[in-house]
Amino acid sequence: MPDLLIVNKENFEEKKKQFIEGGLNKIHILSDFDRTLTKTFVNGEKTLSLISELRRRNYISEDYTKAARALADKYHPIEINTSISSSERKKAMNEWWTKHFELLIKSGLNKKHLGQIIKEGIIQIREGASELLDFLHNHNIPLVIISSAGLGSDSIFIFFQKYKRMYKNIYIISNVYEWDKNGNAKRVKEPIIHCMNKDETVVKDYPQIFKKIKDRKNVLLLGDTIDDVDMVTGFDYKTLIKIGFLNENIEANLKA
């Protein structure tokens, strides 16, 4: 496979052997969402995330779109620049999403917007992901998604519903909105999850999810940024296989 790069083939074969020997009941999947389980390009057009669709399509208002784009233009280059220290990037991401959530709520984000974005937007499930989800479901292998999605866990739930793949073995750890009786966003629960603090988003802090995976020590980790590796922080795994999707900054990410 010309598009597949295995850094250490001998090490990979040993880990694969341990996965096989342990069996399916010792495996769980830990995955990012945007551009990991979704496509990076659709019809030749680059996609970013569900929240980027909200900016792009004026679902709320032109004022929101303008302000949100200004935030993205300022902070996204910092997000993907691995030459900037982790602490600086973490601080910048926290600033970005604190401001963005305040903007979303002030601008009138409604739960109905999530359904519109997923129904009408260009974000699509990654090729092969449906088959993976079916396999995991059929063999009762837990899939834990840790996502910094700006539209939160509700949007991921609706996305999988669209593809009829919101299975009971899928567990989502993401930002959580509180909605009023009319579906308007009132606040986002703390702590805010962003791409740079997944090392602080420890699965043990979610006991209902942790009990499903605590004895499944062989972990397959899926992500599209260097920082996604931090999702496994705090989990006492036996064997870890990491799969990274090189969506952008390919040379820098390969060196890392």
Features from the language model and the residues they span:
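Residues at the C-termini of beta-strands that transition into short coil/loop
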Residues: 173-176, 189, 246
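Acidic, Mg2+-coordinating phosphoryl-transfer loop and its flanking beta/alpha structural elements
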Residues: 145-152, 218-256
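Alpha-helical substrate-recognition element adjacent to the catalytic core
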Residues: 1-181, 256
